[in-house]
A protein has these predicted regions:
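N-terminal accessory scaffold of Fe(II)-dependent oxygenases
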Residues: 1-209, 217-249
Length: 249
């Protein structure tokens, strides 16, 4: 009984810290050459742009059209994933959710790239037993969703994207049906609190990425061509439980 009580107290404490969010509208930036400082910046719990990472050679349009493994991913009933990507453009909205995005990532090679480059820079020895990365591949515009993982890394593969971010404290100003929407497309017909809806646009080019802390709102769009984007969700047991319990995933 005492053990259960102690575990219960620990769970409550961890949940409390998970729910704490910094709502400052500022971002940090760092060059990949300074990656030894990544962990210290992540402790600030504000968005962090990482520049000039080693390029990702997977999940580009060329990669999807050339590797046969993508043709067999069961995303659509009537057409293949390859056909959809080949006909999509910068205005196409990504039609799949996290479960399908994870299936695509599993064959893309994202985990190999992340294990070689990203994980060693941010997952310390003691965090290996606590953080569990989950990988997702997206194609097309992705509307608003709320970050749940302790950290979510967003990175474009082969073209520039614009990521819109909003802190948790703007939630009361959002439309009732904010999910999958885009901040720059909301009007006074969607919400009477449009002037309170503050967001920041961050331009990411291939080789750059954005770490987003939990409890922020994010969306992204491409320019000129369909955006091919990868995300890596660094989950703690608490955030993973919240992810599976969320009605938005």
């Amino acid at each position: 009984m005492e053990i259960l009580l102690v575990l219960g107290v620990i769970f409550v404490i961890l949940t409390f810290f998970y729910k704490q969010a910094v709502c400052e509208f500022r971002i940090n930036q760092i060059e990949w050459a300074q990656k030894e400082n990544l962990s210290a910046l992540l402790h600030e719990k504000i968005p962090l742009v990482v520049r000039t990472l080693p390029p990702a050679t997977f999940w580009s349009i060329e990669d999807v059209l050339s590797r046969e493994c993508y043709a067999n991913v069961p995303i659509f009933q009537e057409i293949s994933l390859v056909e959809w990507v080949s006909h999509a453009n910068d205005q196409s909205v990504c039609p799949w959710k996290y479960q399908q995005a994870e299936k695509i990532a599993a064959i893309s090679g994202m985990s190999v790239w992340a294990t070689k480059w990203l994980h060693p820079a941010i997952i310390s020895r003691w965090l290996k037993a606590w953080w569990h990365p989950r990988y997702h591949c997206w194609a097309g515009r992705v509307g608003l969703r709320k970050t749940i993982a302790t950290w979510t890394y967003i990175f474009p593969i082969d073209s520039e994207i614009i990521v819109s971010i909003m802190p948790e404290n703007v939630e009361t100003a959002l439309p009732a049906t904010w999910l999958d929407g885009f901040p720059d497309e909301f009007t006074a017909k969607d919400t009477p609190f449009l002037t309170d809806l503050k967001y920041m646009d961050i331009i990411l080019r291939p080789g750059n990425g954005l770490f987003m802390p939990a409890h922020w709102f994010v969306s992204w769009k491409g320019q000129q061509k369909i955006p091919m984007v990868g995300t890596i969700s660094y989950h703690s047991p608490i955030s993973l439980l919240a992810f599976h319990a969320s009605p938005f995933t």
